[in-house]
């Protein structure tokens, strides 16, 4: 079995000044290809530390992806450290120098002398093309390992991993490419409760389960390795969906917003949104996807009671009698939002995101959500975990999306989630 490791470089990563999203993305991407990372090391911008970690980890791994330290500044030391670790000199790669000169010419810029550093590679290095940036990738064999050097810029890293790194390791180590993956998106359940339901199942050989928490969702990944396991994947996926029931809200989608976008795109149906506690989050997540203008008619943030009355037509008496966070108010918000442009659907939210503003009757985390359709209105009052303001807003948006998703599938719109409480009208 090939042993894959990752070395992340940079003082800002080591000190926690930036979150290392590159490492998370790389590990997740490798897992989707059926390849697990055995170890990840983070090291700062000190030459002696880089040399030591290259020499030490190359004794144990078969492949090491090194990320960062390929820029033109004095603290970019990956190439120099690799050369010293192998007892080599740095030499200019003429092909990459030409690439740099052409890149700056195309962008109507004069190339700084410091950028020439990016064409200096260890003598034994094999250049790895980076068509989307100025940092030259390369690979070097040291001890038992191939060290594969990539830039820290996320877009450049992702391009090189997909186009260069994965094909290289598959060919070099004759890896079986027969890997399939299904993803199930869930809300309302924690990892432990999902695992309690899934782990008693007897999985066929070659099929494994993984979990990824990205609140408000938890993603279940079902891996199948080998032809027999791949053939059984649909049956296993169906069984898991049956066991989890309403917890599963999407399949092979990263978020519920993506699921809603996919279902509404080119459907001819239209959506309007009126948001109070979610503050535009529902609308914003849909606008992230190209083509959302084909169905999204408007998104209104009606935060104050006055805006609910004047923009959406909520009856002042409703607010006086029931309050802003109530079923009657949110239903009138949804009806008003739908009526403005005669949309097919309208979502509305009103809640207490915290950390202040809660009462004994309506504590922080209390949210009213409504879905207005041409045939009527669905609504519910839910109680969400109080861990953070952002979590309350994110979960509120997710539940609103799920109500719309269920209506589009002609399923029951109001369902129970384990970790989401519900109040009566």
UniProtKB/Swiss-Prot annotation:
Q: Which domain of life is it from?
A: Bacteria
One Pfam annotation reads: CinA
What start and end residues bound the annotated signal peptide? none
Identify the InterPro entries for this entry.
CinA (IPR050101), CinA-like_C (IPR036653), CinA_C (IPR008136), Competence-induced_CinA (IPR008135), MoaB/Mog-like_dom_sf (IPR036425), MoaB/Mog_dom (IPR001453)
The record's annotation in SUPFAM superfamilies points to: CinA-like, Molybdenum cofactor biosynthesis proteins
Per the record, the similarity remark reads: Belongs to the CinA family.
Q: What is this protein called?
A: CinA-like protein
Give the species.
Answer: Shewanella sp. (strain ANA-3)
Q: What is the lineage of its organism?
A: Bacteria, Pseudomonadati, Pseudomonadota, Gammaproteobacteria, Alteromonadales
């Amino acid at each position: 079995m090939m042993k894959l490791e990752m070395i992340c470089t940079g003082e800002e990563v080591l000190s926690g000044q930036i979150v290392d999203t590159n490492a998370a993305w790389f590990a997740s991407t490798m897992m989707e290809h059926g390849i697990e990372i055995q170890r990840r090391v983070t090291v700062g911008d000190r030459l002696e530390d880089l040399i030591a970690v290259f020499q030490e980890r190359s004794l144990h791994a078969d492949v090491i992806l090194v990320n960062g330290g390929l820029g033109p500044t004095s603290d970019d030391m990956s190439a120099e450290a690799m050369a010293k670790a192998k007892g080599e000199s740095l030499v200019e790669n003429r092909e990459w120098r030409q690439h740099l000169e052409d890149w700056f010419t195309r962008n109507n810029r004069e190339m700084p002398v410091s950028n020439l550093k990016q064409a200096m590679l260890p003598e034994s290095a094999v250049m790895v093309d980076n068509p989307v940036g100025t940092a030259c990738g390369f690979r070097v064999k040291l001890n038992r390992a191939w060290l594969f050097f990539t830039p820290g810029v996320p877009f450049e890293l992702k391009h090189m991993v997909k186009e260069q790194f994965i094909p290289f390791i598959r060919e070099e180590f004759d890896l079986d490419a027969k890997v399939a993956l299904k993803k199930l998106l869930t809300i309302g359940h924690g990892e432990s409760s999902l695992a309690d339901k899934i782990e008693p199942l007897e999985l066929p050989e070659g099929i494994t389960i993984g979990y990824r928490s990205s609140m408000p969702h938890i993603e279940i990944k079902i891996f199948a390795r080998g032809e027999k396991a791949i053939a059984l994947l649909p049956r296993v996926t169906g069984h898991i969906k049956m066991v989890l029931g309403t917890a599963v809200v999407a399949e092979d989608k990263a978020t519920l917003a993506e699921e809603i976008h996919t279902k509404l795109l080119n459907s001819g149906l239209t959506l309007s949104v009126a948001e109070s506690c979610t503050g535009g989050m529902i609308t914003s997540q849909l606008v992230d996807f190209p083509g959302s203008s084909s169905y999204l008619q408007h998104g209104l943030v009606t935060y104050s009671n006055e805006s609910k009355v004047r923009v959406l037509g909520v009856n002042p008496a409703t607010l006086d009698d029931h309050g802003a966070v109530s079923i009657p108010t949110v239903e009138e918000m949804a009806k008003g939002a739908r009526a403005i442009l005669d949309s097919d659907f309208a979502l509305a939210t009103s809640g207490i995101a915290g950390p202040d503003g809660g009462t004994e009757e309506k504590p922080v985390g209390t949210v009213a959500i409504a879905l207005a359709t041409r045939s009527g209105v669905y609504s519910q009052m839910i109680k969400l975990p109080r861990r953070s303001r952002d979590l309350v807003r994110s979960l509120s948006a997710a539940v609103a999306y799920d109500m719309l998703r269920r209506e589009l599938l002609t399923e029951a719109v109001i369902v129970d989630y384990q970790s989401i409480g519900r109040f009566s009208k």
